[in-house]
Regions:
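Core segments of transmembrane alpha-helices
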Residues: 57-68, 134-142
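Interfacial loop at the N-terminal end of multi-pass membrane proteins
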Residues: 4, 13-60, 105-124
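Interfacial segments of alpha-helical transmembrane regions
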Residues: 2-14, 70-71, 75-91
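Internal alpha-helical transmembrane segments of multi-pass membrane proteins, especially GPCRs
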Residues: 10, 48, 55, 83, ...
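Mid-bilayer segments of alpha-helical transmembrane spans in multi-pass integral membrane proteins
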Residues: 90-98
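Juxtamembrane boundary at the C-terminal end of a transmembrane helix
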Residues: 146-154
Length: 154
């Protein structure tokens, strides 16, 4: 049973992480050089999908990792790594909800052909917090996965 929880937690956390990492890797160069109109269209398009999928995916991943932390409590090193991973994954969610989502909601209300004069400042702020949350979830995923791969929990 532990193996099933660990497998599901790894898959869901990897999917969530891949959205953050893929966005950071592929869209950051476009955002840096694009016009306000292009930035707005990209953000609005991605967020139409992400705002529906990511809350479910992210919360399910956190719950499964939390279950794995509980199940690993008898193996101290696995417990510690899993718990550290969970804390970082939860911190990713906190940054997302308190920093990125409010900006996303603002952008959703913009007219792509006439973004507000402060669009570049909001883009840079969004990018800074996106980088932070990407580092958090990649680190959290790595710690959690190492607990599963290197330390057997029965």
């Amino acid at each position: 049973m532990v193996d099933m929880f660990q497998f599901a937690a790894i898959v869901l956390t990897a999917l969530s992480m891949s959205v953050h990492f893929g966005t950071w890797l592929t869209e950051a160069p476009i955002r840096e050089t694009s016009s306000g109109a292009v930035f707005t269209e990209i953000q609005k398009g991605r967020d139409r999908v992400a705002s529906r999928v990511m809350p479910i995916l992210g919360n399910a991943a956190i719950l499964l990792v939390a279950a794995c932390v509980f199940l690993s409590r008898t193996v101290p090193i696995a417990f510690g790594l899993s718990l550290a991973g969970l804390v970082l994954i939860a911190a990713d969610m906190a940054v997302t909800l308190t920093c990125n989502v409010p900006i996303n909601k603002q952008v959703q209300g913009w007219n792509a052909s006439a973004p507000p004069p402060v669009w570049a400042e909001l883009r840079d702020r969004w990018e800074k917090f996106h980088t932070i949350r990407t580092v958090l979830i990649v680190s959290g995923f790595s710690l959690f996965t190492s607990s599963v791969v290197f330390f057997r929990v029965h």
